[in-house]
């Protein structure tokens, strides 16, 4: 079996995906072809974002004109999830930006319902909301205080510009949300150093770090993540394009896994990077020399943290075993 066929056949997950940042560019082109030309420079593989604000500006200038109502969330999500199904991705965790509820005056539960309505048969989707660190003390605080009541909300994520300080109240809010059955995540170790990863683990109590790349700068933080059973939901292509790493060969995912840190791979914001989940697996093989067994372990890691029944996890594990043994799963 060719490597490309093996990667396609792997039952995969995506656990780090921003729905606004996953807006399919072809939807924008079909909507306003005069404004969105084919193959813009920022979507080319050799394009590098100079700064996070540079990246954020491009994302917002493309996503905000589109996401103006629930129907647009449905339409985008339907196209996003179709791409997952085509790649044999069977479980997805995706987040919408909480501030959108204020920007377009659309209640969060309506966004959740729109995304949920777009989920096709055979795909498990868990919906999160993400917020800036500063939102904890801003106008969104009343909304944040009600998140535990939102049906269909799997969890929350702290994202955006990592240089912002983490507000002291965040730890208590995250703890309350966990007590209400919500999964808590935090972006850390992307543009901030290993200390931000330690902060997220020790102070916020999360066991899901989005990125985590720069934890490699402090072996003690790597050990902490391994000892606490923390998962790093990593995005190698995003890290390259945003210059978090100088090259894919220097990406630390292999070193993290060798140290006992569970790592997954996802696309982050494919609107900006023009990447797919399969692409992420291919670069692990081509740039970091991952074997098929190691690629399979990455897939297993995604299922280990997936919010699905144990029986489904066992079935998928058996399917991966069959692939590694050279037989075609039934």
From Swiss-Prot:
Residue numbers binding Zn(2+): 16, 18, 187, 268
GO molecular function, one term: adenine deaminase activity
Binding annotation for substrate: 18, 20, 160, 269
Cofactor comment: Binds 1 zinc ion per subunit.
UniProt KW Repressor keyword: no
Annotated site (Important for catalytic activity): 211
Enzyme active site: 190
UniProt record, GO biological process: adenine catabolic process; hypoxanthine salvage; nucleotide metabolic process
Top-level taxon of origin: Bacteria
Keyword Hydrolase: yes
Any one Gene Ontology cellular component term annotated for this protein: cytosol
Enzyme class: hydrolase
Coiled-coil stretches: none
Cofactors, names only: Zn(2+)
Function: Putative nucleoside deaminase. May catalyze the hydrolytic deamination of adenosine or some similar substrate and play a role in purine metabolism.
Record-given protein name: Putative adenosine/adenine deaminase
Species of provenance: Opitutus terrae (strain DSM 11246 / JCM 15787 / PB90-1)
């Amino acid at each position: 079996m060719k490597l490309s066929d093996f990667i396609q056949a792997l039952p995969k997950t995506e656990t780090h995906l921003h729905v606004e940042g996953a807006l399919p560019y072809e939807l924008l082109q079909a909507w306003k072809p005069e404004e969105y030309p084919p193959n813009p420079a920022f979507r080319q593989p050799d394009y590098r974002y100079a700064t996070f604000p540079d990246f954020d500006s491009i994302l917002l200038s493309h996503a905000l004109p589109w996401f103006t109502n629930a129907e647009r969330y449905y339409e985008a999500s339907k196209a996003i999830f179709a791409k997952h199904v085509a790649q044999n991705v069977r479980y997805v965790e995706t987040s919408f930006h909480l501030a959108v509820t204020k920007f377009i005056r659309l209640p969060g539960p309506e966004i959740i319902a729109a995304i949920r309505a777009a989920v096709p048969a055979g795909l498990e989707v868990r919906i999160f909301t993400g917020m800036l660190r500063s939102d904890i003390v801003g106008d969104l605080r009343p909304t944040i205080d009600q998140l535990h009541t939102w049906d269909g909300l799997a969890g929350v994520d702290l994202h955006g510009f990592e240089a912002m300080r983490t507000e002291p109240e965040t730890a208590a809010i995250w703890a309350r949300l966990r007590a209400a059955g919500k999964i808590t995540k935090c972006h850390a170790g992307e543009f901030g150093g290993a200390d931000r990863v330690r902060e997220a683990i020790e102070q916020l109590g999360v066991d899901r770090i989005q990125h985590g790349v720069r934890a490699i700068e402090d072996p003690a933080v790597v050990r902490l993540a391994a000892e606490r059973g923390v998962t790093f939901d990593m995005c190698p292509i995003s890290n390259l394009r945003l210059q978090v790493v100088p090259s894919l060969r220097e990406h630390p995912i292999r070193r993290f896994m060798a140290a006992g840190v569970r790592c997954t791979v996802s696309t982050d914001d494919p609107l900006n990077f023009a990447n797919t989940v399969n692409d992420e697996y291919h670069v692990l093989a081509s740039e970091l020399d991952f074997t098929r067994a190691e690629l399979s372990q990455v897939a297993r890691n995604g299922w280990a943290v997936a919010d699905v029944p144990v029986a489904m996890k066992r079935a998928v594990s058996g399917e991966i075993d069959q692939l590694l043994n050279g037989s075609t799963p039934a």
